[in-house]
From Swiss-Prot:
Similarity comment: family membership: Belongs to the 'phage' integrase family. XerC subfamily.
Cytoplasm keyword on record: yes
Record note on quaternary structure: Forms a cyclic heterotetrameric complex composed of two molecules of XerC and two molecules of XerD.
Protein name from the UniProt record: Tyrosine recombinase XerC
Subcellular location: Cytoplasm
Domain Core-binding (CB): 14-106
Amino acid sequence: MTINRSRQPEDHEVARCRWLEPFLSHLQAARNVSPKTVTAYRCDLLQYFSFLKEQAGLDRLEAVEPERVEVADVRLFMGHLLDKGIQPRSIARKLASVKSFYRFLLETGRISSSPLSLVVTPRLDKKVPRFVSEEEARQLFRRFESQEDNAALQGDGKKAEVRQFETFRDRAVLEVLYGCGLRLSELIALERADVDLVHGFLKVTGKGRKQRIVPLGEPAVEALRKYFEVRRNFFRIPLERTGESSRVFVTSRGRQLYPMLVQRMTKRYLTPVSESEKKNPHILRHSFATHMLNGGADLKSVSEMLGHSSLTTTELYTHVTFSRLKEIYDKAHPGA
């Protein structure tokens, strides 16, 4: 049978898709995953169920019986994705979603065996993290001290006040991203109570709502202190009345920052100083890890500060450390 690859499941089909909603509810309740992650699981599994439906010649998703799926069906699904030009990394992610679904069915006694037990995840090349150089990072923050940037703070009126507020906020945002290695979602979710400027640390809520303590360097402490002072003066009416005051970083209207704003902000400030193709908030997280390891920090400590659940993830950054060690060796060793 020819598979209709363009058709998406309709809402009423999704609602009746067998065992999908119990699994998604389990993700939210037991594993504390984010809504964005739940949406990704939903999309991956609906694509899987839709393929099985078409493959079996069924007329609706609710007719798909996960317990009757065989290893060959899963491998056909992987081949179908490859045929569509889906990249191996994306296929591995979709396969991980399907494996999690069947693990849930096994644990809840809905099935007695999983067809995924004999399916091997495609081998992936490790992606080397992109980062800005230490000199580029210095130039990034030097721009805030330049006469050109300070000129934007001059003048009277509301527009000048907004520029001043946003300039101090932007510097604090970038100092925290680079100085603490936070994810974008973690930065946006920071509460005022999570910041301790006296002792110099942040309490960060990461993936799976796991909390960790991250040290604040002096540049980040100073940037936050100045930002909080400007913020107090800018919002003449206490933010407590707006319902938004608990967030550390807000817009000039007192609302919580949103991802696109921080992405645009990061690109705007990095473009003049960095030759890196990527100019997003995550590259500052990569730079934090790379520069920490280059400076001699141990892998376990960096892993804890990044909120990684496994050292394997952090090991991706060691390629830069080895490059740096080779550079030092070549310069220092007489026989190099």
